[in-house]
């Protein structure tokens, strides 16, 4: 089957004038659009039917030919081809421009591509294009030489003529007996005049010599030179001049010249030559011609892509493009007319400039000068505006399409549903499944045809709902809650038809969707094809999505009422009815409870299945009944954390279906016993502790002392502030302890907080104790505590202070949401082509995972290595036993064994060191945390990584902490810190780090503070003497370089005979040690670095400390670029992973290291070429690391010199824009710049990522196995059914 979509790459390049003409169906010569009386397009206008095709299907403009039978005929009267009206969406026209025009993308970009190629500044280029200056386009060297000679001859002739004239005059004056003074005056005047004449001629000669191709001339200079030397040079202005210059460029010669320049120059000139060389190479490789950047023919967009629609009042609404095209055509026609009638040059020049401006506005309105407005102040949307931004073609229509077979409604809780089900309102389901219901009605003979089936559905007859029930049985639906932050925000459910208008959602999936029932809405989508249904059922069903892909923790854990119910069920109540009774087995105990003889929470003794006597409660027996037999009896209180652990363990034992059944049972238990517990909260449940008054009074006293000391000048403002804060923090902790000690363990408030259902001790402290210290909007703690509790009520001042935090919280949430969303978008873009494409890349490299020194800052080693593959044997330090072999997965048992063995570092495979040239391999990635197994082939791990980091972004704080009282340092934390790291920006407070190993010396004097690092490395140079040689030096003697150390001892010959080149000479200066036939010279190489320390920075080292390169000398954050340059690639990767992990872990968000490693890998995947060697690479070019290694390997195999390069750390935005796929980069940011570069380089998009395939409408490369099978099956089915007549009016997917 030959499909339009059957291609695997897309190339973009510059269009030549001939290509533009070949696309066109005719020239647009008139600015008219449609005739306002007949409402038909004007001939040769912007909507002409002859050029673009008929307005009505198979009907020409004059009406001579109608119907499909005339298809392909061109009407002899009106010239319109008989075809479908939809050809007006694809047929283009063209405008033959009266003069060449510069394409604004190539003339005005930064840097300007035309300017770079012609070595012109943007300012000079603008002067030429907009007809202000002339540029020399050609110089005739022979004519110049001849002109110079002629000038010299003219000069000599003039001087000679003038000389003879003066001689005649002098002779005449002598004859008239004139004074000597008068004669001398004439001679002096002649001398001055001769000098002036020579000077004028020399100036003209210099001007001639200075005439070079590409030089700019003002109008006056041009006319002056043209008058005298019209045959020496040619100059012109406008895009015409540039077209001429660009067409003269010989790319091969230009390349050789620039290569020479990059090697022989340095600094700014070399940098510019490097950029020019890259551009020249781009034109050479892409077979684009530079003159195509100047347009002589302008393509005209098909009319249906710039429509004109009649409104109700008879007026017309039109696309802005039509107005912009109209301006171009009007000016072009006027210019042609002026040129034909031979108008003055100045008028023609002005019209040419106006044409250039009109074309600029059409291509990119507002890039130069004032934007062209239509209808008053509304800025016209140009072709570039249609592509760029959120509302542009890429993001609005290609990446974010609206879909049919979808609906939306409010969600309510569905406590009676199974985990895999959702409640779908009948009316909604009927509309969504309408075609399927109609098809079934016809098939079952309930309706004779589709039309009557539609009528039956619209009347909603009872048999229709019976059919609907059958249809939805085998068709899952997708539920989506916006914002779709991660994979779990879209899940598949089996629909259960319900009455009412609201969707019903299972309470356990709420946390995955981050949904609650306060008015949230969700969207429903219907998977249509068999492949889609199969994928939804096998991978998207909620029972297959119970674990978080970010951390591997359960996401379907019970919450709120369910947690409280389970906690209440498993707690004990001393003195309850039936306490101390003994039962023979669990069933007997449950029977006695049901008869009301014993209380649910009474402590009883029961014999378990193994014959052991347990002290437990009936509630715990009931709870354990729902757990699998493999899980031992849980004889304890079950709060939220315990439920999470139990679910995690059960997931490894049970299948998805059994797991769902167990979770549903826990849910039912939770709801049942939360209801029967009869929990409620009253004001009386919150009691203020008696100790509060004393503690507050003591704190007030300590505060008064600090204030008094400050008033007397004994302590500073900082010390006073810190003392007060410390006092009240301590008091708050003591009151919290007092509240906890006085709690009624059976009280509803305590049980709610302790179970993890709702609330925590901090909130109870604010209700019963005191609210404590508050922060101001900048994040600084206010040194005025709120001493009242919410139970007692706040004073007006206390209430005012507490509003600061509340308002800041709301503002933060709003800002965080957008910031987090943008971060996720950038992360998605940088990793969207990271897909598992290989089983094993075979690398021996890996990364060391080390037990963190600061507990609580990073996850423990056991958590970080779980699910990874080893890159080396893991050996028990005491016994020498191999715990895990090389290249083997570390599962829970092995991870536990590693922890118990006391191993503090493990060498594991990592995405950072994966050597797959495209995507990644399974072993380096390891376990898919959401599925708890080795990652499947074709999994889009890049997207998963981006979602895992972006999704909890809204939970991160948005503030920079202000430390140390009044004058302090801002420490960036939370979301801004994550962004700072991923964008590889210099930190706000940048730490100074040592570039070398050495010893510290801290210097403080009137010039400020300095740190000097001195490094003394001692080396040895050894010289082994042959036997019979005589040493010329002694031990501990100092020798200089070049000094003789030993010489051969020759008998009977004088010393003069011994050749000097036979002696052993010292290669270095140092101290000698002689030991037999071995001479050793010890020498040291010292290195020193000095750093100036700003006054606000805190020094972290002291004099005499020995430090390593890369170690911090001051507080603050390290610039990742410094780590890369000093310590290299591995160190910067480790730094990025650990720093991002610290931010999330400190906020209680668990993300696996591998997700951050995937991003870090993409940030370091490019290298910058230093020297090209024998390769085609250009110095300064950014190249993919793997491509660079491949090119070098080929060159080395052929015996050539390889290129050299250094690793580049790029921020995620830059990395996204420098991706191999130009489609993905253009749809991200800076659309016009990306497309400009891609066109010049003639880039080929191999369609290896996800975005580029979504844009062109192909299936993404990350397909699951079942989906691939179903797609093949469907293609075969369609091929088989192509010959059979389809049932009229049915969707293709019903086949």
Curated annotation (Swiss-Prot):
SUPFAM superfamilies: beta and beta-prime subunits of DNA dependent RNA-polymerase, Rudiment single hybrid motif. One of its GO terms (biological process) is DNA-templated transcription. Mg(2+) binds at residues 516, 518, 520. GO terms for molecular function: DNA binding; DNA-directed RNA polymerase activity; magnesium ion binding; zinc ion binding. It comes from the Bacteria. Pfam families: RNA_pol_Rpb1_1 (PF04997), RNA_pol_Rpb1_2 (PF00623), RNA_pol_Rpb1_3 (PF04983), RNA_pol_Rpb1_4 (PF05000), RNA_pol_Rpb1_5 (PF04998). GO terms for cellular component: DNA-directed RNA polymerase complex. The keyword Magnesium applies. DNA-dependent RNA polymerase catalyzes the transcription of DNA into RNA using the four ribonucleoside triphosphates as substrates. The RNAP catalytic core consists of 2 alpha, 1 beta, 1 beta' and 1 omega subunit. When a sigma factor is associated with the core the holoenzyme is formed, which can initiate transcription. This is DNA-directed RNA polymerase subunit beta'. The lineage of its organism: Bacteria, Bacillati, Chloroflexota, Dehalococcoidia, Dehalococcoidales. The gene is rpoC.
């Amino acid at each position: 089957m030959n499909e339009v979509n059957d291609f695997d790459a897309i190339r973009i390049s510059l269009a030549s004038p001939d290509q533009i003409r070949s696309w066109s169906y005719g020239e647009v010569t008139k600015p008219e659009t449609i005739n306002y009386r007949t409402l038909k397009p004007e001939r040769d206008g912007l909507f002409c039917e002859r050029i673009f095709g008929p307005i009505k299907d198979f009907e020409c403009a004059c009406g001579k030919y109608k119907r499909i039978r005339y298809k392909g005929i061109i009407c002899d009267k009106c010239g319109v081809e008989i075809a479908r009206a939809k050809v007006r969406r694809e047929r283009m026209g063209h405008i033959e421009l009266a003069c060449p025009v510069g394409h604004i993308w190539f003339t005005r970009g930064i840097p300007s591509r035309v300017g770079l190629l012609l070595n012109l500044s943007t300012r000079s280029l603008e002067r030429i294009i907009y007809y202000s200056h002339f540029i020399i386009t050609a110089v005739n060297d022979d004519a110049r030489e001849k002109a110079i000679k002629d000038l010299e001859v003219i000069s000599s002739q003039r001087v000679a003529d003038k000389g003879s004239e003066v001689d005649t005059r002098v002779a005449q004056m002598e004859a008239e007996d004139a004074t000597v003074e008068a004669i001398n005056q004439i001679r002096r005047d002649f001398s001055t005049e001769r000098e002036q004449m020579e000077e004028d001629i020399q100036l003209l000669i210099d001007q001639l010599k200075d005439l070079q191709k590409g030089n700019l001339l003002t109008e006056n200079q041009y006319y002056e030179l043209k008058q005298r030397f019209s045959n020496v040079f040619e100059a012109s202005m406008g895009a015409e001049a540039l077209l001429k210059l660009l067409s003269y460029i010989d790319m091969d010669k230009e390349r050789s010249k620039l290569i020479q320049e990059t090697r022989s120059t340095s600094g700014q000139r070399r940098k510019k030559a490097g950029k020019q060389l890259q551009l020249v190479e781009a034109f050479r490789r892409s077979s684009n011609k530079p003159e195509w950047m100047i347009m002589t023919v302008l393509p005209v967009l098909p009319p249906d892509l710039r429509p004109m629609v009649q409104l109700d009042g008879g007026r017309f609404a039109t696309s802005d493009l039509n107005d912009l095209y109209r301006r171009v055509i009007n000016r072009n026609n006027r210019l042609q007319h002026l040129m034909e009638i031979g108008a003055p040059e100045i008028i023609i020049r002005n019209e040419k400039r106006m044409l250039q401006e009109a074309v600029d506005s059409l291509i990119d309105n507002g890039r130069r000068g004032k934007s062209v407005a239509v209808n008053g102040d509304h800025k016209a949307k140009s072709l570039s505006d249609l592509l760029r931004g959120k509302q542009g073609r890429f993001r609005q229509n290609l990446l974010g399409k609206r879909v049919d077979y979808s609906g939306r409604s409010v969600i309510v809780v569905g406590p009676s549903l199974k985990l895999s089900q959702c409640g779908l309102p009948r009316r909604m389901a009927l509309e969504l499944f309408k075609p399927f219901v109609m098809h079934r009605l016809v098939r079952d003979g309930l309706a004779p045809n589709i039309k009557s089936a539609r009528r039956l559905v619209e009347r909603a007859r009872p048999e229709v709902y019976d059919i609907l029930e059958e249809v939805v049985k085998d068709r899952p639906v997708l539920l989506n809650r916006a914002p779709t932050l991660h994979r779990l925000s879209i899940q598949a459910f089996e629909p259960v038809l319900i009455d009412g208008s609201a969707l019903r959602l299972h309470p356990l999936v709420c946390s995955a969707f981050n949904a609650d029932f306060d008015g949230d809405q969700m969207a429903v989508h219907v998977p249509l094809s068999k492949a889609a249904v199969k994928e939804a059922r096998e991978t998207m069903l909620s029972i297959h999505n119970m674990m978080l892909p970010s951390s591997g923790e359960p996401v379907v854990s019970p919450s709120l009422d369910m947690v409280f119910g389970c906690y209440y069920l498993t707690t004990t109540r001393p003195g309850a009815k039936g306490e101390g009774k003994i039962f023979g087995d669990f069933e007997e105990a449950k029977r006695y409870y049901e008869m009301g003889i014993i209380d649910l929470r009474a402590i009883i003794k029961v014999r378990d299945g193994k014959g052991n006597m347990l002290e437990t409660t009936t509630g715990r027996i009931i709870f354990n009944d729902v757990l699998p037999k493999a899980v031992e009896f849980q004889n304890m209180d079950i709060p939220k954390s315990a439920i999470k652990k139990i679910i995690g363990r059960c997931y490894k034992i049970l299948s998805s279906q059994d797991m769902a059944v167990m979770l549903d049972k826990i849910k039912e238990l939770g709801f049942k016993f939360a209801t029967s517990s009869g929990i409620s909260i009253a004001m009386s449940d919150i009691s203020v502790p008696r100790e509060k008054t004393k503690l507050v009074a003591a704190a007030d006293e300590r505060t008064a002392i600090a204030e008094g000391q400050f008033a007397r000048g004994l302590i500073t403002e900082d010390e006073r502030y810190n003392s007060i804060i410390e006092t009240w923090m301590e008091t708050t902790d003591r009151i919290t302890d007092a509240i906890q000690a006085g709690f009624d363990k059976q009280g509803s408030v305590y049980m709610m907080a302790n179970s993890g259902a709702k609330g925590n001790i901090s909130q109870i402290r604010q209700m019963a104790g005191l609210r404590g210290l508050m922060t101001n909007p900048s994040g600084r703690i206010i040194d005025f505590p709120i001493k009242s509790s919410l139970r007692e009520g706040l004073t007006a001042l206390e209430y005012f202070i507490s509003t600061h935090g509340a308002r800041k919280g709301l503002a933060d949430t709003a800002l965080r949401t957008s910031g987090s969303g943008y971060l996720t978008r950038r992360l998605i873009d940088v990793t969207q082509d990271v897909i598992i494409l290989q089983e094993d890349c075979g690398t021996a490299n890996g990364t060391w995972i080390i037990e963190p020194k600061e507990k609580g800052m990073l996850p423990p080693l056991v958590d970080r290595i779980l699910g990874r593959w080893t890159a080396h044997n893991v050996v028990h330090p005491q016994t020498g036993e191999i715990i895990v072999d090389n290249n083997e997965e570390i599962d829970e048992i092995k991870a536990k064994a590693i922890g118990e063995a006391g191993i503090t570092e493990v060498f594991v495979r990592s995405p950072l060191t994966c050597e797959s040239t495209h995507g990644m391999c399974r072993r380096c990635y390891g376990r898919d945390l959401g599925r708890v197994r080795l990652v499947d082939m074709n999994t889009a791990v890049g997207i998963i990584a981006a979602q895992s980091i972006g999704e909890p972004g809204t939970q991160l704080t948005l503030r920079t902490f202000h430390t140390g009282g009044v004058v302090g340092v801002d420490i960036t934390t939370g979301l801004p810190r994550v962004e700072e790291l991923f964008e590889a920006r210099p930190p706000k407070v940048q730490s100074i780090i040592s570039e070398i190993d050495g010893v510290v010396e801290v210097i403080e004097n009137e010039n400020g503070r300095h740190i000097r690092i001195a490094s003394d490395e001692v080396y040895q140079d050894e010289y082994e003497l042959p036997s019979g040689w005589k040493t010329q030096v002694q031990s501990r003697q100092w020798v200089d370089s070049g000094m003789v150390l030993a010489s051969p001892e020759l008998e009977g010959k004088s010393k003069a005979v011994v050749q000097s080149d036979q002696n052993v000479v010292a290669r270095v200066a140092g101290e000698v040690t002689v030991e037999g036939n071995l001479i050793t010279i010890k020498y040291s190489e010292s290195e020193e670095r000095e750093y100036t320390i700003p006054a606000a920075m805190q020094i972290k080292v002291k004099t005499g400390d020995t430090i390593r390169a890369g170690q911090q000398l001051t507080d603050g954050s390290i610039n990742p670029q410094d780590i890369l340059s000093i310590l290299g690639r591995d160190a910067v990767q480790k730094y990025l992973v650990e720093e991002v992990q610290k931010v999330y872990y400190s906020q209680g968000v668990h993300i696996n290291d591998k997700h951050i490693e995937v991003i870090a890998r993409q940030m370091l995947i490019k290298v910058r070429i230093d020297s090209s060697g024998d390769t085609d690479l250009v110095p300064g070019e950014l190249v993919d690391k793997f491509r660079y290694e491949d090119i070098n390997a080929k060159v080395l195999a052929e015996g050539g010199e390889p290129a050299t390069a250094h690793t580049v750390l790029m921020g995620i935005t830059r990395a996204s824009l420098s991706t191999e796929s130009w489609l993905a980069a253009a749809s991200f940011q800076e659309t016009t710049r990306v497309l400009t570069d891609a066109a010049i380089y003639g880039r080929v998009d191999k369609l290896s990522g996800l975005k580029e395939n979504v844009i062109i409408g192909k299936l993404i490369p990350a397909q699951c196995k079942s989906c691939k099978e179903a797609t093949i099956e469907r293609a075969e089915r369609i091929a088989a059914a192509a010959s059979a007549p389809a049932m009229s009016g049915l969707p293709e997917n019903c086949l």
